[in-house]
Amino acid sequence: MLRVLTSTLRFPRPWKPLETRGCSSNPGAAGREIQVCALAGPNQGIAEILMNRPSARNALGNVFVSQLLEALAQLREDRQVRVLIFRSGVKGVFCAGADLKEREQMSEAEVGLFVQRLRGLMTEIAAFPAPTIAAMDGFALGGGLELALACDLRVAASSAVMGLIETTRGLLPGAGGTQRLPRCLGVALAKELIFTGRRLSGAQAQALGLVNHAVAQNEEGNAAYHRARALAQEILPQAPIAVRLSKVAIDRGIEVDIASGMAIEGICYAQNIPTRDRLEGMAAFREKRLPRFVGE
């Protein structure tokens, strides 16, 4: 059993640092629908994916999806990334969901292939090695909510509007919504929300457990982003390998029976034993000082 579990688990692997960091260092970034930012100073270790397609309210079109996959592949190889935030550069919108105007021009075969690609995108987000946070400062509908559901943590403005509304358009959630929403809220409630296509405010979503935090919106329209940053800053000082292995243990363990889940936890724990960070944590405790984790 342990051998089978070990062969199927995806553990964090060594990463290569990016040659270029920060949005301003890329002169072509301004015209892109997806921009990658690496924060500096006390926020070093926090990376951001900025979704910026104002003409279509960050709808999930072909170019948008391609650039998002490219950004994830880039960040996955960066060992300096300890937390990844998904945010919007379009005021009042997180992600409006699928680009239905673009999809209307597709053949039935093309639609099937594109939705399969969307499903793969959400899987890549869910499998990202470091913790991910969705900062939902506005509408997150259909695929937009599916994107947020693929993240580990969600923060929303109280006034944000979200829902899996596909049934109101003659569709059903096709990018993970039918699977991740029940795992988040339970089967009966997920069915009710999907069958009715109901929209929820950020405050309602928090009451149901769909988002971790709901905050009052500010004049700039980025209150959820600031709360997401504060949450990321809480994660930053913790041992990055232990955090990533905790993510693996939770994500894989929740899919199996508890005995298999305990075995997965044991495998993850064994991976952490030889790390320098574990020794540093014990030394810091003994010496009554804050630990300095380096991710090794």
UniProtKB/Swiss-Prot annotation:
Location in or out of the cell: Mitochondrion
Site (Important for catalytic activity) residue list: 146, 166
GO annotation, cellular component aspect: mitochondrion
Residues with PTM N6-succinyllysine: 101
UniProt keyword Zinc-finger, yes or no: no
CDD domains listed in its UniProt record: crotonase-like
Pfam families cross-referenced by the UniProt entry: ECH_1
InterPro entries: ClpP/crotonase-like_dom_sf, Enoyl-CoA_hyd/isom_CS, Enoyl-CoA_hydra/iso, Enoyl-CoA_hydra_C
Keywords (A to Z) from UniProt: Acetylation, Fatty acid metabolism, Lipid metabolism, Lyase, Mitochondrion, Transit peptide
Major location (coarse): mitochondrion
Tree of life domain: Eukaryota
GO molecular function: lyase activity
GO biological process assignments: fatty acid beta-oxidation
N6-acetyllysine: residues bearing it: 101
Family that this chain belongs to: Belongs to the enoyl-CoA hydratase/isomerase family.
Protein name: Enoyl-CoA hydratase domain-containing protein 2, mitochondrial
Source organism per UniProt: Bos taurus (Bovine)
Gene encoding the protein: ECHDC2
